Structure formats: structure tokens, C-alpha cells
Amino acid sequence: MEKSEQTNSFESSNNNNNNIDSNINNNLENNNNKNNNNNNNNNNNNNNNNNNIENSIDKNNKEDNSLVGVNSHRKHRTRLKSKKGNKHETKKEIDYKDLLIKLPHNAVSNFNSLENESSDNLTPPPPINSSPLPLPLSLPLPLSLPLPLPLPLPLPLPLPPNKENIEINMEDIIIPENKIKNKNNNNNIDINNNNNNNNEKQTSIIEMEDLDKLKQPKINEGSTGKKGKSHFFSFLQRGDKTNSSILKSSEQPTHKKTKTNINTPPDYPIHYFGHHKRFSSSSDEGSDNSKSQHSSVNTPTLSRHNIDSLPESQQSQKQSQQQSQQPQQQNKTKQIQQTILNNNNDNLNEVTPIKKSSLPTLEVSPIQSNIINNQTTEKHNSGGFTALTSASAMNHQNQRRYREHHQINHQQQQQQHHRHYHHHINSGGSSGSSDKFDYVSATGLSTKNGFNPKSLDVDHFPISDKRNNINIQAPSTPVQSRNYPLFTTQSPKNANSASKSKNKLKNLKRKIASSITGNNPSGISSSAFNHSFSSWNNNNSVYTGGNSGGGSGGGGSGGGGGGGGGGGGIGTPSSFLDDNNNLNNGENFKNSNSYNNNNGSNRSISHDEWLRQFYHKHLERYEKTKAVDYLIIKPWNFISWILRPSRIANYQSKILYRRAYILNFLNLVLFVVYLLSTILSSNEWFIFAPGILLSVIYFFLGKINNKMYLIAFLTISTAVAINITSIIYDLTHTRPTDKLIFSWDLLVMIMVPLLFPSIVYSIVILISVAVTYIGLGIYVQSSHNFYLLDAYDSFGELLRSIIIVFVILMFYTILSSVDLKEIERKESRIQSLFRISNEALVVHKDGLITDANPAFESMFQIKLQDLLYPIQSGIWEFLPALEGMFEPGASKLFDNPDMGVIETTGIDSSGRTFQVEVRTNKATYDGEPVDVISIIDITGRKQLMEADYALRKAEAANEAKVIFLTTVSHELRTPINGVLASADILERTTLDSTQKEFLNCIKLSGNYLLDLINDILDYSKIEAGKMEIIKYDFSILKMLDNSIRIVSKNIYEKGLDLCIFIDPNVPVIVNGDQRRIKQILLNFLSNSIKFTNHGQIIIRVKLESDDSTHSLIKFDVEDSGIGIKTEHLNQLFASFSQIDSGNSRKYQGTGLGLSISKRLCKMMGGDVKVKSEFGVGSTFSFTIPCGIPNTTTRFSLQSLGSAIYMGEDIQGINKPIGKKKYGASGVVGIVIDSNKYTRKSISQYFAILKISCVDFENKKEFENYLSTLATVDQTTNPQVYLVITSIIDINQLTTNGLPRDRIYHWILMESPNEERKLPLEFENRFVKPAQFADIVRCLYKIDSINFFIEQMAGSPYKASKDLQSGGSSNESGDGGRSLSGGGGGVGSNGNGNGGGGLDSNISPSELSSSEHQLISTPLSDVNEFEDINLINQSLSGLGPSAKVLNSTYFNGLSQSSKIYNNNNRNGVGIGNHHHDHYYQHRHHHSLPPEEIDYDESPFLFLNKPIRKVYHSQPSTPVTNGIALMDSSSKSPSIPSSSSASASALSPNSRHSNELGNGKTTQSFVFSPTSRKFSLNDSFNPSISTIVLPQVSYSPSMQGGNFPINMESVYKKIESHNNNFKRSESKPSTPTFLSNQPSPATSNSPQLLQSPTTSTTGSINLSPHRSPNIRLPLEVRSGSLSSLKPLREDEELESISDDHTSHLKGSSHSINQQIPSTIQQQQQQQQQQQQQQQQQQQQQQQQQQQQQQQQQQQQQKPQQQQQKPTTTTTTTSTQLPQNIEKTTTTTTTSTTKPTATSSSSSSSKTTKTQQQQHHPTTTTTTKSEKIEKTAAATTSEKIEKILLVEDNFVNVKIFSKLLKDSGYIFDVAHNGVEAVECVKKGAYDLILMDCQMPEMDGFEATTAIRELEKSNLIESPPSKKHSHVVIVALTANSGYKDKQKCLSVGMNDFLQKPIKTSDILIQMIKKHLN
């Protein structure tokens, strides 16, 4: 009795179980007693390792102790009785125990073994009214049984009605529904109920539909064999045990003495490796969050029905016991029930309820189930069995109580369930249920949403981990409660215990710690070892035992998450406190089963992955602890470092490397042994002392040396020597004894094979050692003083020898095993390489195949067995070409190492031939030399080679195409030149409306074709890698303005809006290739215009990133067009393609724009992106990295606006900002527009200028805003409002409610297409889209109209590549770079080419609808010439040149802005009728345009067309030296009949329209009202105006000439311009040109004055003429007195005399007359007469000389006959003043000088003189002008030109242009003829075509230069240059092409097509004037 009381809870549980078994079977009871007695000797082990067998027992229940004592006494008495059957029973017990323990860990094999079993052996379903069998609550079977149950049983053990309710804690197993027929469906096994009634053997997890398939097996209740076993145990024993490594690896140990089984604890180490991937669950659906077995692992109790199945003696005994305990049990039940209710049912077992359709049984409420279980458990501990009630009564009671409890807790559960579900991750036990799982089916789960687990693969359930709050648990089959009150199920709706999981988490941590360290605090079982299957060992009792921690709480709900209780007692309510004295209140029920917390992820993991996650995650924290770190990790690392060979050793063999560890370890051991021997053996210390030193030496040698064999030999030799020496010393110096102490002979001999893996070394050393020790033995034996004993009788010596031998042999075994594995791996690796090789490997002997790999079989379509059987096949059968190699005498070919690779044809078994590559090698196979042939199928390689050849061929063809496109650019451009130039010539003639219309079509088509050619050439350059990126400084604002003006008209013509958004942080001046950036932007804009029909187009400029060297600028072009589908985005940037054929037919274009743009962007280091939504719009973006400017400091738009606002100087701007127009008072911006983007854009500009702005959509919103303005004090400065509106109806007259105490300035913002005058209600206007410069000009008195666009520190163009290059560029949307302003083309859809001359057919509204616009012919490409100084430098050889007064508005223009008005590259040429919109509203300002832009370019002064100026009322007074118009000119709507100038300047005047139609040449603007000539000097910005003498102005003066004192004019110029120089002969009085002949030279300046009109104010102008005014800036020769006064005629006449010879190329001059007095005219006539006399004298002298020359020529006729017929000779005859000078050109072999009679010349001269006093002039053509008298002749042109051109169209065009200009020229058709002409005649200039047959221009130029060096050609006739000037006519505009022209000796170049004569004439005069 005392001994029983000392046992722990584990023994108590065993005793309780033994009590049950003793009532059933005495033999079983005896076995249990034996086990209990054995367990008494191992209490601690039982406490630590078997904690989960029993649930908590209340130690406070004192009456249970007596029962324990009785049970112990009973066991002791029956011990001997059961001894006989121990052997048999032990065997059964081992099987049973193994199965019970291993089944949950690897139960898959058991389940698989049942798949093929029939259902015949299954029991039928139990009766519905069968009574439950009450069993102890704290017995979670089967794992809870510590005792082995001998099978077969002597008596049938009653089973519960439902066999699955024999609790086996199958929570970790989900059985698929397709296995419902398997016998493993018995999930819950109670070992105490092995044999139940035959009618109650059906498992409750089998659904009703399967019950009819089950049969009742025959069971002999009295048998003791297998028939008496549980059917579940039967299937366990028949399971496929061999398939499970776990089942095979486990054997039940037996006690050494008693031979009985040792109870294997549940924490069997199978947990480390026994889990299968089937034990997993999905996270939401298909997973069992409830894990009911944790919450209701209640030990089954015996029911009355089960008792009835027992023998009568046992039945009576158990009934009496139950009846005796009934009152106590009822009292206990009431206490438990009250306790449970007081704790809010937190201790309820949360189990997934069974599907109601599964079995027709009654569910038991969780409360009642726990009460019953507790009652029965208490009764069981008391030793009695009590039947509580019948099945029907119990079912009825359970139903009622379950419904009551469900109704009470349903609402609360619904509120807390969501929170509890998320607490699953923090739970340490296993509890909780997903709300998706409502019922349990045979497969384990069924959900409310219809989820059926059988549709899932059981192998792919995710695994949860409870240890680290992560779910890695196995799915379980929930315990069901049908017909059995013990196995209660509960819906998750009744679970309320998840809110208190902190204590459970603490207990879980203690469990993990105890499992790792081996300690079990608070009775926690280590069997759970940190994974979810610990639930099998959790008893889940409602209460924990209060006294001791004997049994394991195992994560039990009431026990505080594992607080252990006593030996089976039911416990008291006080045990609700866990080990930390924290009240759990049953919360562990909620979280103990929280396996599934994967948050909806159905990820499946393999078994190995599960183990890795399981152990790695949970052991990681302990590995990182200091204790583990310092006690395990660091010591092990230190030991490993000591033993590990260093890197110096460098072992090449892993075998030797591993043995080096052992060698170093052995040396350390020897060191310790020698050291101890030296210390302990005082009389022999000198023998062992050397070993200390030697072992240390050997150790370090082993660390740093790889001579392992040598070191091992020395080590063994030293050990043997010292050992034998010590023995001999003992024999000779010590007292003889009767025995010999253990020697090292065996140890050393074992170490030999361990250290010497080589068999030779090992045998030799072993023999040596053996002989040595045998010799020692002989010596000892011969000494007769000692004798060797066969065995030692000392236990210590024996133990020591065994341990040493064991350790050494273990090392040897491990190393040998590792070596063997490595050898096997190498062999398998070689075999695998042979098998998996892609090369066909065949082994043959003399050509007969002996082996082949699978690649050979696959390649030749034959099996290996067919190759070898019935006879061996020959290799020649598959490789016929090798047959000769196997003939007799030819076998030596395989021995030739230089045989190399053979390419031949292989034949497979089907006869298919293919190309193979064969290599031969020698090898050894089965110990015999064989030949190995490797065969590679090179069919794919051959195909690849063919494809590569085709690719190379295609690339060559593509390169040929590129070369073709590049080289034939001349031929492509030549027809365009003929078309465009011819159209320009025809345009100058008188045409009717039809002719003009079709002529315009010709020009449009030609320019469009030129655009296509430009794209193709650009693409070909990119493909050929010849595209150049030239970087220079430029202004982003300027580039945007140029781009926008090109496309703005097309945008607004389609009804679209264009808006610009520029981020304030964008730098204004950057370094990059502006030309290419602009090309990309224009391509995107053109694309957006093409595909957008409504809405707007938005341009956004952003700064993506910025650093000290680069700025990444992003340009976005967003449209609201048709959009692009996602699948078509990849096709956008393909060359020559559009999205689909539909778009291709609808939209024009080559499909190259986007492709070129992307490639250009990539070349500049940027990128192109596109975002599009079909039907909504697209956004094309490109980023360009731009460098910092080289010419100025980098500044952003925001800093620019801030500087303007603060009045600070701006770096990079040459002129200061003017003051605010509206004083110091504040300004408020108001924007009114219907488009929100337009309003936002302008508001952004105001924000940059730090000015507040409001915007409104319509007039109503604006008036509402005005009504909110409060009246201010009149004494203060009135508020100024700048109202910008695009709605003309909103103005100062129509707007209601304007406060009168404020000032309003109204600005009209109009579309470029609107043709209307500026209404009086508005002060100014600008064109859409609004830009930053427009807002600044409206606010400030700036001194330049192009302030922000041209004043921005113009940077030098890095290479003057387009200098004087007329024609078209390679840029889409780009114009011809004509420096004389002609030949601009046009393209479709806004992609036209600018640079054209002024079109005579263009109305003034087409040119500009602004009253303030001044437009000049685009003489040069502003983009190409950012700094005009570079042009001056390139033309420095010309000397001082005349300056151009370009028409701009303000003085102080910077150098970079002088030619802005000439920039037509960015727009369509003015000569192009289709795209002249570029000049509409080009410049908008608020000041009267009365000043002249002074351009410093030395060659840009020729033929600048200009519109007459429209004057409008200025918005503010001008005080900067700029005179205002008088009242007669302020109103543009009132034409002035009293002033010809006013009439011409009026925008509504018909004359102004006619003036606008003509091409004008403007030098300055004269205002007759103010009598001022406005002049801007770039060298001296202080020049503001040139004030002319004031004269009376009246209608009576219309017919007279206004006198102009030119002396005063020149003084004014000289006073402000130091660089201005007059000629040596200064005029005394100014003279005006007239129609009379002028004796002045060709370089004399002229002042052309427009004629005054008649009283009607009308002037009849030629459609191709317009008035011009030229202000001379430099006089080369002659005097101003030679100038003749202008006069009026009905028609203006172009005067062609010596003074205007430099204007010959232009026919667009309009004579504007300035009145002069009669006195001045008389003075001029006198001066002219004097000059004429001088000229007559000179002419007479020349005639005489010519006559002499003619006589000499007549004397030498042979010389005349030798003149070439192809050379055109021109002879000029110098005639007297009254005789006309004519020039005749012939192409015959002789030259016939032609002269006109003196009378004819005299008559014409007289007529011309008479016409001076007539009020009208006559109009003549150019040819007539040349034939006129000397009045129409300026001077003799002695320059001679050679035209070298192979195209006859160009010959005609150029000849016409040269002839009209009065030049003498010859024609050569190729380079050979050009060289011949140069040898035979002298020329001043050669126009050399570069691309010609026979000899191109480059070769001809080289030849000509060589002739010049050799002095073989004559010098130029004009003597202006020392060598002939050669100008290239090239179709290529690349920088390298131009450099090539210059490198061969050409002086300049012109790019074809040359569209107008101005381009050619400008180039000629550039070099000849």
C-alpha cells in the first residue's frame, strides 16, 4: 500500500487501467501489475516520457489512493499467474504498441494497406438505441495506455457502440472519403474496449450511404486468439508494415530481467522523422480548425450495454461497483456542472459537430459530455463501473441539453468567432474551429459552403505548426459523439475561449523547452516534441490534477495548457489555475486545436519540407540562445577547428581529408596518454615523455601538411615503439607479476586500416605491427617471468578495452561507409552521365556493339536488346561510311589520335538519314580495352548553319538596301528639286486662279514626297549606323515654341486644344541635340493630331532626375484620341508598319515616325514609353538626358520666374527685363476658357511669376466672382486685373458688374485659325497655346518680342553643318535651311518642311491675323545657328559687310535673337501655301512695331521679305525711346486717305492685303507720323530710333517726294554704332533712287521708298511684288549724291542698276517712295549726269579695246576653230551711257559679240529720263530689265561661273536662275568635262554636283585643286580670289558629308533640292561680292 502511494500519476493511471483489466481478464491484470512494478523503478522516466498517456488526476481526491493501493496489491498477487503467457503476449504487445505509437506518425501506409480490403470484414452499423459504455474520462486511448495489452484477449473486450470512438487521438489524420470502406476508419480506439458488441462495431465516421455495405463479422466472445481481437487491431496488424520505415524501425523493448515489455513512452523519437505529407490540412476549406480530438479526447466509459457483453461474474461485479459509486458520482456531477457554468463554458471541448445526416444518433452537448465523462472518470478511479443511462434516454437528454447550450452560446460565439479565429496563430494547444466547418463526414470535414474533402488530394494539405504559432499540424478526423456520450462534438459557434490564449502560449513555450532539454516541468510530455501531434498525448481533461505533476497535461484545456495532474483523478475546480497560477478558464479548449492558421493559403508541402520547417523554425530560437551557443555551438566549432586540417594542407582526396581528422584526433589522444603516463608512471616517465613532443609535432604536421600516409606511419610507429619499450622496461626493471596489463597491440592494429585506406600500405603496416607484437609475445614468453592471459578478470580493464575498440571501430565503420557511399556515388554519376548524355555513346569491339546508351536508342530508333540479341549488330549498319574502318588491317585507324571528327550520314532503323558527327575514343570496359564512339546528331546544327547563312544573306541584302538608300539620295532628291524649283519659278509669273490652285498642289505633293524621302533616309542612316548626334546648348522654351508653331494650326483646324505644362524645376538652357529632340517631339505631336478627332493634346515637360552633370527631362504628349489596344502596343515602334490595315488605309504615313523616334531616343541615352487605353487616349513619353550648358549657368524656369518677379538680373539673358507695365501695384490674373487644361496651364505660368490667378469656365462664373469683390478705398493704389479670355464676348463692354475701383486689362487669346482684327475692347492678344513668354510680355515692358525664346544665351553650334544649306533637311517637319529664305516645302498633317520663301498667293490673314506681327523670310535655320558669331567667323574672309535691319519690335536684341524671324525651319515655309500657318500670330506683343531688328550677319541682308506692319493701340505707354503713332494710325479700322504709308500699314486696307501677298524685302520700318526709322544695333543696344527730319504732312504732299537728309541718318547710325563705316566719299545731300540710270557702282547703297498713292489710296501692285525699304548700312564706293530720288508710277518698277546688283536674285522688291523736294531732285540729276559722263568715257575706252581684240581674233581663225563646242562663251560689250549693254550667250564653236545701236540705247535712255517726272511706273520682267538701258543696268558682271550638273532638269533650272541674275556661266555634265573646262578657261566659282557618273564632284575637285597647285589653270577673272571657289551641290546633309566636301577642297556646300533662286544667289554672292 505504501509502495503504491509513492508511485506517480503515471503508475496511478496504470493501476486504474489494471483495475479495469482485472475485472475483465486476470491475465491482463497480471501483465499490468508487472508493468506497474517495473515502472516503480523508473518513476522519473515515466514522469518525463509518458506524461500524455493519462490526463490530469486530482490528487486532492483522497479516496482514490485506497483504490490505487488495492489495485497495486491485486497486481502483485496476479504477477506469477501471467508469467507463462508473457512471451506470446509480449510479441503481440510489441506489435500492438508499435502500431499504436507509430500509426499517427506514419499512418498512411496502414491506410494504404486497406485500400484493397473488402468490406466483408467490416461490422454493420450499431443499433441506434444501443447504450453508451462509460469509461474513464482521463484515458485518451490508445496512446494513453501505458500498459501493453496482450492479444488475443482471453475474453472479448467490450467495444463502444461506435468503433471509431475508441479514442486513438486521430485528430492528426484526415481519411479521404474514398477510403470509407477501409478498416482504418475506426479513428478513435479505446484499448479497454477491444471487443464490443457485434451490433455496435460500425464506425461513426462512416456516412449512412455506406452503412448498408457493411457486414457483421463473426466474433467468438470466448476465444482468446485473433478472433477475439478488435477489428481495428486486426487491420492494424495486417497493415502494410513493410512499407513504413517507421514501423520497421520500431521494436518494443523488454525489461532485462523480467523479460516484459517496457512501456514505450508516447514521446517516441519517431516524431523526428515519421511524419508524412498526408498529415496536412488546407487553411480555410478542407482543414479542421476545430481539431475536435484535442478538445474532446475523453476517455470512453463503459455503458450498460458493454457490461452486458461481459461474463456474468464480471457483469455483476461491475454493476455493484457502479451502484456503490452512484451517489458520489451524482454529487460530483453537480459540482462539475456548476463549476463549468461559472467559468462561462470556456472549458468546453470545441469539436466539429458531426454531420447530422451521417448517423441517426443523438449528439451530446459539450457540457453534458464533460459532466458525464468526469463522472465516469471519478467512478472509474474509485474502482467501480456505473451505467448512467440507457442509449435512448441518454440520446434524448443529450439532444435537449445540446439545444439549450447551443441557444445560450450561439449569439456570443458569433460575435467572438472572428476574433478567436485570428487568435489561432497564438495558440499553443490544439483547439478552435473554422466557421466554414459545420459538420464532419467520413472524410473528416464537411463545410457549410458545400466543401467536400474527398475532392482534395490528401497529399497536399498544408501543415501547420503550433510551436511557433504557425500551423503545421496534420489534419485530423474529428471525434464524433453519435450514440456515445464520451465523444462529444460541438459546433464552433459554441466556442468562446479564444480570447485568453496568452497563458496557453506560455505553457506551449515551456513544453518546447522541456522537449528540447529533456526536462518536463509541470508534467509536460516530451512526446509532443514541438509539433502538432502532441495532441495525441493531450488528455484534455476539464481539470488538472492539483497535487503532483505526475501525468502530463499535454496541452489540456483545463490544465492551463499542459499543466499535469495526478494519476487519473478527476481533479478539483482549483486546478483551473495553471502552473503560473493564471486562470485559464478553459481557453485552451479554443486554441489547443488551432492547427489551421494558414490564412486561406492552400499551399502544400512535401514531407521533407515539413520536417525542415518544423525543426528549423522551432529549434532556431534555442540555437541562438546563449546557453546553446556557449555549450554546444562554440565548443563544437572549437573542436572542429582543432581537428580540421588547415587550408595549407590542401588535400585533393576527400578520403584522405576525412582521415586527416582522425589522425589529428589520434595525436591529441596520444598526447594526453603520454602526458598522463609521464605523470603517473614516475619510474618510466622518460619513456613516455618523448611521445608528448612527438605527438604535438605530428599534430601540427597533420594540420599543415597533406602527407597523411607519412604522418600516420610515424604516429603508429611511435605508439608501437613507446608501448613495446614500456613493456620491456617493465619486464626487466619491475617485480614479476602473474599477469600482463593491457597492451596497445589491438588498438594499433585497428588504427592501421583506419588511417591507411590504401590496401598495400594497410597490409604492410598491419604485418609490421603484428610481427612486432608477436615478437614481443615471444620475448615475454621466453622470459618465463610473465604469461599472457586470454582474458582479463578486471571489469575496468575490460570496459576500457571495449570502449576504445568500439570507438575506433565506429570511426572505421563510419569512414568506410562514407568512402563506400562516395564510390557508389561516383560510379552512379558516371553511369548516369553515360545514360543521360545527349551524345549517342556506343561501345564496340571490332565494330560489334556491346553496349549503348539511351541517346543511341533514341537517335537510331532501336532498343539495346535488339542490338545485342539474337546476334550483335555492327556499327556500320548505322554508320555505313565507317564500314571500311573495320575491315582487316584497318582497325589501327582507331588508334590514330589525329583521326579527329568525322561528319557522315547516319541511318536509323526506319531508314531515315540524317547528318551526324562521329568521334572515336579508347576506353576500358569490364577490364578489356574497347572502342567508344560518340555520335552527335548535327541535323539541328546544319539547319542552324543554313539559317545563319540565310540570316547573313538577309543582312547583306538589308545593308545593300541601306547603302542603296544612302547612295541614291541624290537621285531621290533631284526630281523633287525639279518639281519644287519649277513650281517656284512658275509662281513668279502671272497665273489665273486655276493655275495657282494646281501649282499649289504640285508644291504640296512635292513637299510631302520630300518628307517621305527624309524619313526613309533617316531610317537608312540609323540602320547603317551613320546617324549623328550633335550636342549643343539650346533653350527648351525656344524648342517648344518652334515645335508648337509648326503643328498649332492643324491642331486648331481639327477643333482640338493644345495645352503646355512645364514643371517649374525644368532647366531652361540645356545641352543636347535640339534638332533630334525636336524631331521626336514633332513625330509624337503629328501622330497625336492624326489619331485625335476631339478633345485636346497636352504637352508636359518634367524633370525626372537631376545631378551635377545631367538632367533627365521627360516629354509627355497626351491626347484624347482613339487609343491603342494592349495587344497592339508591341507593334507601335516597328518600322514601316502601323497598327492594322484599317488604320493604314485611313491614316497616311510610312510608319517610320515612331520607329525613328525610338531609335533616336535610344541613341541619345533616353527611352520611349507609351500608355494607352483604347477609346480613351494615349500618352507617348520619352526621356532625354541633357547635359549642363556650356555657355551659361544652369537655371530653372522657377528661378527665371522668381528673378523676373524680383527684378533681378538673369544669367544667360543679355537684356534686362523691363519694368512692370502696371506699376508697383499688385496684379491678379484671370483666365476664362472653356477648356480646363488651358486654364490650368496659364495659371501655372502665373504661379511661376508669383502672381495669383483665378480661372473660370464661362461668363457666368466670372461675373459671380466679380460680384464678390469688395469695394476698396480710392486713395490706395487700385488693384490691377489682367483678364485673359478666349471668349470674345467676354470683354470690358459686355461684362456686367465690373467694379469701377479697379483697373482691367483685357487680353484676347485666340486660335491661330481665327482671322479677325483686334477688337477695340481688347488691348492685346496672343495666339493659342499660351506660353510663358506670352504671359511675361503681357505683364512686363520687355525689350524683345522673343525675349524668352531668343534671348536665352544662344549657344554656338558645334559644327556649322548646315551653313548656307538650302533645301530640305532629314528631319520630318523640318524645313529647308535656306539662308536667303527661299524654297520652303510643306508636308501633310503638320509634318511639312519649312524654310520657304514668301508666297505671293498667301493672303495676309494666312500669314498673320495679329496686328503686331513682323515676319521675315527664313534666311537661316535658327536651330542650326544658335550663335550668329559662328557664321561670322566662317565668313570672316568677306570683310565688313552690310548689316540687315530685321523687323522686330524692340531695341537691344541679343545676338541669338537677330534672326528669329528668319527661322522658318520650325514651320512650313511662307512660300508654301499649305503650311503658312506657322507665321500666323507668330509674335504677339503690346508695343507698336516701329523698330528694326539689326542683324549682324554679314550675308543675311539680301531680300528679306516682310509683311507691312499692322499697328494697334499699345496697352501701355512706351517711354524707351520708341515713338508712338498718332491718332490717325492708332485705329486700324479707319483707313487714311491722306497718307500712303498709313494706307499701306492699315490692316483693313486692300493695299495692305496686296502688300502681304507679295514677297517683300525689309530693312527698317518708317513711320511717317513720327518721322522715325527704328533701328536696333546688336553691337550697341543703345540705339533705339533714327529720327528723320520733320516735314509737314498733308494730302497735298502725296504727289511729291519727302526729303530725307541722309547725312543726318548716317550721323545717327554712327553715333550709336561704332562699327558702322561709310565710304570714303560722303554725300552732301541724300539722293533717292529713281528709274533713271545711275552711274553709281554696284555696291552703292540705296534707299527705296514706297510710292504714295492717289487720292483714292489705292496702289496697283504686281502680284509678285511688294514695297521694300532698304537703309544702307555701308557704302563700298561712290557717294550718296549718286542716289536718285524715287518717284511714283502706276506700277512699281524694280530697278536693276549697279547699286542694286546684289539684289538681282530677288524679284520681290517693292519700291516704297519717300517724298523729296524738287531741289533735291535737280541736285541728284546733276550728280547723275556727271556720273554718266564718267561712265561713257570708260565705256568708250572699253569698246576700243574690244575692237582691237576682235581684229586680233580675226587674224587667228585657227584658234577660234579650236574652241570646244560645249563651252559657252559670253562676251560683254562696253557701251556708252546712252547705249544698252547686252550680254549674249551662245553654245556654238564661235562667240558672236552682240551690240545694240547707239540710237536705240539713246532712245531708251531718253525715255527713261522722261519717266522720272511721271507719277506712275511701268512693270517689266526680269529679261526685259536686263535688256534695258544703262538706267536699268547696275554694272558689268565679269564673274564667270561653271555649272557642273548631270541632271538636265537641274541644268535648265540653274541656268535660268543664273541667266536671270546676269551671271556668265558655262555648263559641264560630269567631272571629266569640268576638269577640261577649268583647263581651258578661267572661272570665279564652280557649282559642283557631288554625285555624278564617270567622275564625281569629289574627284573633280581634287583634280582641280591639283591643277591649281601646279599653276596649270588660269586665275579667276574677277581677281577677287586667288583661287577658284567651288561650291558643292549635294543631296546629303550629314556632318560627315559636309566635312568631306571641305576636306577635298570645296569651299562651301548647298543641299539639294534648291527650291528658290534666292538660295543659289545668296551662295554666289557670299563668295563673289
From Swiss-Prot:
Basic residues bias locations: 72-86, 416-425
Keywords for the protein's UniProt record, in alphabetical order: ATP-binding, Developmental protein, Kinase, Membrane, Nucleotide-binding, Phosphoprotein, Transferase, Transmembrane, Transmembrane helix
Sequence segments annotated as region (Disordered): 1-91, 218-335, 412-436, 468-505, 551-598, 1359-1415, 1521-1563, 1617-1709, 1755-1832
Any one Gene Ontology cellular component term annotated for this protein: membrane
Catalysed reactions listed for this entry: ATP + protein L-histidine = ADP + protein N-phospho-L-histidine
Protein EC: 2.7.13.3
Protein localization: Membrane
Histidine kinase domain ranges (all copies): 967-1188
Residue spans of biased composition, Polar residues class: 1-10, 242-252, 293-304, 469-492, 1554-1563, 1626-1665
Residues modified as 4-aspartylphosphate: D1889
Biased composition range(s): Basic and acidic residues: 56-65
TM region positions: 660-680, 684-704, 708-728, 747-767, 795-815
Primary location class: membrane
Sites of Phosphohistidine modification: H970
Biased composition (Gly residues): 551-571, 1373-1398
Signal peptide, first to last residue: none
Lipid bilayer topology: Multi-pass membrane protein
SUPFAM superfamilies assigned: ATPase domain of HSP90 chaperone/DNA topoisomerase II/histidine kinase, CheY-like, Homodimeric domain of signal transducing histidine kinase, PYP-like sensor domain (PAS domain)
Bias (Low complexity): 11-55, 280-292, 313-335, 574-598, 1399-1410, 1527-1549, 1755-1774, 1781-1821
InterPro entries: 2C_system_His_kinase, CheY-like_superfamily, HATPase_C_sf, His_kinase_dom, HisK_dim/P_dom, HisK_dim/P_sf, PAS, PAS-like_dom_sf
Molecular functions (GO terms): ATP binding; phosphorelay sensor kinase activity
Domain named Response regulatory: residues: 1840-1967
UniProt-listed PROSITE patterns: HIS_KIN, RESPONSE_REGULATORY
Stated role: Acts in the cytokinin signal transduction pathway that regulates spore germination. Required for the maintenance of spore dormancy. Does not appear to act as a cytokinin receptor. Probably undergoes ATP-dependent autophosphorylation at a conserved histidine residue in the kinase core, which is followed by transfer of the phosphoryl group to a conserved aspartate residue in the receiver domain.
Protein name: Hybrid signal transduction histidine kinase B
